[in-house]
Amino acid sequence: MSAWVLPDHIADVLPSEARHIEELRRGLLDTARSYGYELVMPPLLEHLESLLTGTGEALDLQTFKLVDQLSGRSLGLRADTTQQVARIDAHLLNRQGVARLCYCGPVLHTRPDRPHATREPLQFGAEIYGHPGIEADIEAVLLSLECLRSAHAQEVSVDLADVRIVRSLLAGLPVGMHQLAQVHGALAAKDASELASLTRDFPSASREGLLALLQLYGDATVLNEAENLLKPFPGAREALSDLRAIAARMDGVRVTFDLADLRGYAYYSGARFAIYAQGASDALVRGGRYDEVGAVFGRNRPAAGFSLDVKQLVGVVSAPSLRAAIRAPWGDGGALSAAIATLRRQGETVVCVLPGHGSEVDEFHCDRELVLVDGNWVVKAI
């Protein structure tokens, strides 16, 4: 095999795309900072138990594992950053009030999340710890929408769900893990006959409620129907109220609901959301409330947040035009060097043309040049 061949679903990022990714990264972090979020940088490599404790089998299968040559302990290359940020909040910051944290860095997956996806996403995320109220959920959604606006994503829409609805319907029932997985599968596939078979021994209210969920997807009228159908279940009513409050804050955005959507059921503890945009075959952003995320670190704080893959985002938003550069001759003269330095300090891109290479400036378009006129270096249009 040729030495330059990379592993499947791993790729080099070339200049034009790298520039776009970096501009998006800066814009996303600046947007998070404008909301009061502080940047943290967890390590790419960590003890395996710290990365996987409480995360479930899915993340375990996605994590590359190796042995530490210093200690002999098992290490993992992070497949998701949320658990690390929860550890930082619980032990390193240990704040009593609200903590707003954001991050942006690579993660590694043993398998791609979807067809043609990279196994090395650049994950950006923001999380708010310490507030159990709906305000934190709303802020997470609003910040994620603002992040997509800053990236110029088009035709953005939000899909909302809440795991508390199904949990409320199943509360107190003697449902084993295997049967629970089957029920989840039937709900995800919207398979009414399979769900009816699986729930035939359930109390009628729970059975009818679960079957009703298969039809409860669409616009806000879904919430009205659900409130009528799920009256016997206080947990479901609370979840519906929260979904209505979240949706009310999203002006100018198409909002849909799918009350049978159970993605992240073992991870989320309340409302969850997925955000789509023109050109994306899958959700660009996923987030919600995950109050149990810090429990394994001895500090079970309320938490809400979201994450996205900047490399996925770059594929669906247009790159801003590159600011035209200035072409300058190569030289070591004091006046020339001073003129170039002054222009660069002013924010200009100045490309010095090396001897024998004419106007080779790669992706930079030069619409001006630095020329010597009457003993002074001046910028002129080309």
From Swiss-Prot:
InterPro entries associated with the record: aa-tRNA-synth_II/BPL/LPL, HisRS-like_core, HisRS/HisZ, HisZ
Functional summary from the UniProt entry: Required for the first step of histidine biosynthesis. May allow the feedback regulation of ATP phosphoribosyltransferase activity by histidine.
Gene3D superfamilies: Bira Bifunctional Protein, Domain 2
Organism for this UniProt entry: Acidovorax ebreus (strain TPSY)
Note in the entry: This function is generally fulfilled by the C-terminal part of HisG, which is missing in some bacteria such as this one.
Residue runs in coiled coils: none
Protein family (similarity comment): Belongs to the class-II aminoacyl-tRNA synthetase family. HisZ subfamily.
One Pfam family named in its UniProt record: tRNA-synt_His
Gene Ontology molecular function, alphabetical: histidine-tRNA ligase activity
One GO location term (cellular component): cytoplasm
Record's keyword terms, sorted: Amino-acid biosynthesis, Cytoplasm, Histidine biosynthesis
Name by which UniProt lists this protein: ATP phosphoribosyltransferase regulatory subunit
Self-association and partners: Heteromultimer composed of HisG and HisZ subunits.
Gene name, Swiss-Prot/TrEMBL: hisZ
